[in-house]
UniProtKB/Swiss-Prot annotation:
Official protein name in the record: ATP synthase epsilon chain
Domain of life of the native organism: Bacteria
Chief location category: membrane
Subunit structure: F-type ATPases have 2 components, CF(1) - the catalytic core - and CF(0) - the membrane proton channel. CF(1) has five subunits: alpha(3), beta(3), gamma(1), delta(1), epsilon(1). CF(0) has three main subunits: a, b and c.
Ion transport among keywords: yes
Subcellular location: Cell membrane
GO molecular function annotations of the record: ATP binding; proton-transporting ATP synthase activity, rotational mechanism
UniProt-listed InterPro entries: ATP_F1_dsu/esu_C_sf (IPR036794), ATP_synth_F1_dsu/esu (IPR001469), ATP_synth_F1_dsu/esu_N (IPR020546), ATP_synth_F1_esu_C (IPR020547), ATPsynth_dsu/esu_N (IPR036771)
Function in brief: Produces ATP from ADP in the presence of a proton gradient across the membrane.
Family to which this protein belongs: Belongs to the ATPase epsilon chain family.
Species classification: Bacteria, Bacillati, Chloroflexota, Dehalococcoidia, Dehalococcoidales
Amino acid sequence: MAKLKLDIVTAERSVFSEEVDLVVAPGIEGEMAILPHHAPLMTALQAGELKAKIGSEEYSMVVSGGFLEVRPDRVIVLADSAERAEEIDIARATEAKKRAEARMADKYEPGMLAAETEASLRRAMIRLKVAEKRRKRPSV
């Protein structure tokens, strides 16, 4: 069966680099599935869960923005930030969520700060969701 080379990188490090069967990414128009021999494309990513399947194993990562380039045999993700599910610090993500919720409750926060706070809350919730899914599954 044909495979795709998936590379996920940030400015600081390479997060994931493997041959995979399927990539599911959070594009700005919604979730997109990419199989080998997909038509070339380039798109922006929104904060969300990025999944990669290798056989019956599924790997989850959290990406916070960036770009995704698809070639027929390769997917390259240049992410603003990215972390594998097993790297997520649940206590830190829970604290970030609480801080964002407290800021959201502040009705005097100007519009731009409110948008940043919503984005922070969304990232924290995604990180917690991905970490929780990993805890419920057997180790990969």
